[in-house]
Amino acid sequence: HGTINIDTGFIVYNERNYPNFVKLIQELDIQTQPSSMSFSVRLANPDLEYNGSTLRQLFVDKRNLFRPWFYKMLRDILRFNRMAAAAIDGRPTNWTLRELLDEHGFSQPFIEYYLVPMGAAIWSTPVTQVLDIPAHFFIQFFENHGMLTVDDRPEWRVIKGGSCQYVKEIIKPFANRIRLNHTVRQVERFPDHVTVDGERFDEIVFACHSDQALEILKDPSPAERSVLGAIPYRVNEVVLHTDTSLLPRRRQAWAAWNYHSSDPLENNGPVALTYNMNILQALNVPDTFCVTLNDSSSINDEDVLERFEYHHPLFTLEGIAAQKRHAEISGIARTHYCGAYWG
């Protein structure tokens, strides 16, 4: 049947929000293709299922036609999209999403069945922590990614053949010098060099998580402790599989991103989410390949292809303030930092 490359980590990008990445893949002459960023919600309590892409898919569960609270949710989505950007004007940066929603009287169905699932899915964050995200951060992300409008959304794209294609190209000049599965235990800085486990180098780039960098540094500065220590990570269990029972029950509701939960706001555990990779990567194959976060117990063991463990940054008030301090620690003492935790 040939080989199919399926991404389980990095998947999509768009030209508006990823200009440097776009330049990189153009420089490497990497082929890309359009993707879909459709989103569905499936809840057990209440028994609810919808896909937000089209009017028909919103009402794929015919009971939604006769639920007054479902229409209230839809009205509040439109109201939130209209007023969100103006609502944060003049507000302190530590003003939370919860405070914004309370002040403007948004309904419980909108919060529990739309906004919280969306936020939990985007940032791989427990549902109970979504409302504590700073409103500025949340709304600016939505605005920058065209999520507060229906007519100015960026076109999302994927790497044709999977993200391994650009990785192979970028490492070509030095592939034989990469040391895989090589644990770094300690980095020490000196005025004219740095050492990595005793081996001497001119400079060092920490392309890893904030907490990992802090653990490896022998003598972190007060600024490094403050900045890197302010951005925690959370473990997410990831499974690549072909069990379509993790997708919405109604096939017409299947989306690229599929959120599922038993209790919308009672679950303090990690977000449960299934990516339909056939939709995301435009795979024209008989099997439906899924990537599920944090719901491995629901997956049929016979359908499991591979298991992974990923760590995602948690965006707290302290962490978002720390993101603005990149220049205080990067490029200093022969040390440079990059990673998803910078936002």
Regions found by a protein language model. Name each.
Residues 1:
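Glycine-rich FAD pyrophosphate-binding loop
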Residues 4-7, 14-135, 139-140:
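Mobile amphipathic helical/loop "lid" adjacent to a hydrophobic cofactor/ligand pocket
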Residues 10-18, 91-95, 104, 147-169, ...:
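Short beta-strand to alpha-helix junction loop
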Residues 33, 177-181, 336:
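General small-molecule cofactor/ligand-binding pocket signal
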Residues 134-135, 163, 340:
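Conserved donor sugar-nucleotide recognition element shared by glycan-biosynthetic enzymes
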Residues 138-194, 201-202:
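Helical element adjacent to the flavin cofactor pocket in flavoenzyme catalytic cores
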Residues 182-312:
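Mid-domain catalytic core of redox enzymes
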Residues 298-343:
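C-terminal catalytic lobe of FAD-dependent flavoproteins
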